[in-house]
């Protein structure tokens, strides 16, 4: 792997980054020397670095990310592993095509850590957070041609905005928020994270604001980010394809931060673990379906107290794992 010099010079700012549920990832992924591993959400490369270190550098890793800035930073971090690490600018749902491109036929482990990274949240110009004012963007890949959150907020109908906030944010105030957004943009376009947060907060009754532990805009920002980046669709595509690409004994580890995502993973693993689907009154199986995975996590694995004290953002992380039969 060739490191990007512009980011390698600042590499020290990323080495302190500790990825979420790191010990749990290594436990369930159980990487071994000579294995081939996919990190579909490379981010700053923390999980990948730990996987390679666990194998003494004697493994092969494919890292994907659609955030060019994060990809460049991870490339610098993983440069010591040389050509044993391959990185690509891509969505994790594209993993199979990239495996074909580089000649990989099977995986011994696959990891995706879904959601926005600390680097993205902490960079105001990316527009993911309302804690620091910035342009209303929220795209994982700002250089791409997908519409930003600003476009969605300033052009979406009340019905469309309500659907997004209700579905992806599960916010009971979705209708009020959608109407408040449309009313506010009629006066002036909503172009910054601070203004959107103010508009959303104004839609909440005072009694709701008083009893809520989180900022009223939290769910709306989450919903818009998921809609802008097609996050649920991305996950569905990945889950439909990953089992076919796993070697026997290969493990799939998925970290989610949203109940909808966790539900998709839970159901996908459950369905792949099922055998015969024939009605009970049929004495001999005619469907031919056989279990393809063993589910390793009966319930989602969450962060321990020590990690929560060190990183409050880990509080909503849930890990599920399955092993290819």
Curated annotation (Swiss-Prot):
Its EC number is 2.1.1.199. Keywords: Cytoplasm, Methyltransferase, rRNA processing, S-adenosyl-L-methionine, Transferase. It catalyses: cytidine(1402) in 16S rRNA + S-adenosyl-L-methionine = N(4)-methylcytidine(1402) in 16S rRNA + S-adenosyl-L-homocysteine + H(+). It is found in: Cytoplasm. The keyword Cytoplasm applies. One of its GO terms (molecular function) is rRNA (cytosine-N4-)-methyltransferase activity. SUPFAM superfamilies: Putative methyltransferase TM0872, insert domain, S-adenosyl-L-methionine-dependent methyltransferases. S-adenosyl-L-methionine binds at residues 45-47, 65, 92, 113, 120. It is an enzyme of class 2 (transferase). One of its GO terms (biological process) is rRNA base methylation. One of its GO terms (cellular component) is cytoplasm. The keyword rRNA processing applies. It comes from the Bacteria. Specifically methylates the N4 position of cytidine in position 1402 (C1402) of 16S rRNA. PANTHER family: 12S RRNA N4-METHYLCYTIDINE METHYLTRANSFERASE, S-ADENOSYL-METHYLTRANSFERASE MRAW. Belongs to the methyltransferase superfamily. RsmH family. NCBIfam families: 16S rRNA (cytosine(1402)-N(4))-methyltransferase RsmH. This is Ribosomal RNA small subunit methyltransferase H. It comes from Oleidesulfovibrio alaskensis (strain ATCC BAA-1058 / DSM 17464 / G20) (Desulfovibrio alaskensis). The lineage of its organism: Bacteria, Pseudomonadati, Thermodesulfobacteriota, Desulfovibrionia, Desulfovibrionales.
């Amino acid at each position: 792997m060739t490191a990007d010099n512009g980011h390698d010079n600042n590499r020290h700012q990323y080495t302190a980054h500790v990825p979420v549920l790191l010990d749990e990832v290594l436990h369930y992924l159980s990487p071994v020397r000579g294995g081939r591993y996919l990190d579909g959400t490379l981010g700053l490369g923390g999980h990948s670095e730990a996987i390679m270190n666990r194998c003494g550098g004697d493994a092969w890793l494919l890292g994907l990310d659609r955030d060019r800035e994060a990809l460049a930073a991870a490339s610098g971090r993983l440069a010591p592993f040389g050509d044993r690490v391959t990185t690509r600018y891509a969505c994790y749902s594209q993993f199979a095509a990239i495996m074909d491109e580089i000649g990989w036929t099977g995986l011994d482990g696959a990891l995706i850590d879904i959601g926005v990274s600390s680097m993205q949240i902490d960079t105001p110009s990316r527009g993911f957070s309302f804690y620091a004012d910035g342009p209303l963007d929220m795209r994982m890949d700002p250089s791409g041609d997908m519409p930003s959150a600003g476009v969605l907020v300033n052009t979406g109908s009340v019905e469309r905005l309500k659907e997004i906030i209700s579905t992806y944010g599960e916010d009971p105030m979705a209708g009020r928020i959608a109407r408040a957004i449309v009313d506010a943009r009629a006066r002036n376009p909503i172009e910054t994270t601070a203004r959107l947060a103010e508009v959303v907060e104004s839609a909440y009754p005072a009694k709701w604001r008083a009893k809520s532990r989180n900022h009223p805009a939290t769910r709306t920002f989450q919903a818009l980010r998921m809609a802008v980046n097609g996050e649920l669709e991305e996950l569905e595509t990945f889950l439909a394809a990953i089992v076919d690409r796993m070697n026997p004994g290969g493990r799939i580890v998925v970290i989610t931060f949203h109940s909808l995502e966790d539900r998709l993973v839970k159901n996908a693993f459950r369905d792949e673990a099922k055998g015969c689907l024939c009605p009970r009154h049929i004495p001999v199986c005619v469907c031919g379906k056989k279990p393809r995975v063993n589910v390793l996590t009966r319930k989602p694995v969450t962060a321990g107290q020590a990690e929560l004290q060190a990183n409050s953002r880990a509080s909503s992380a849930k890990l599920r794992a399955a092993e290819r039969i």
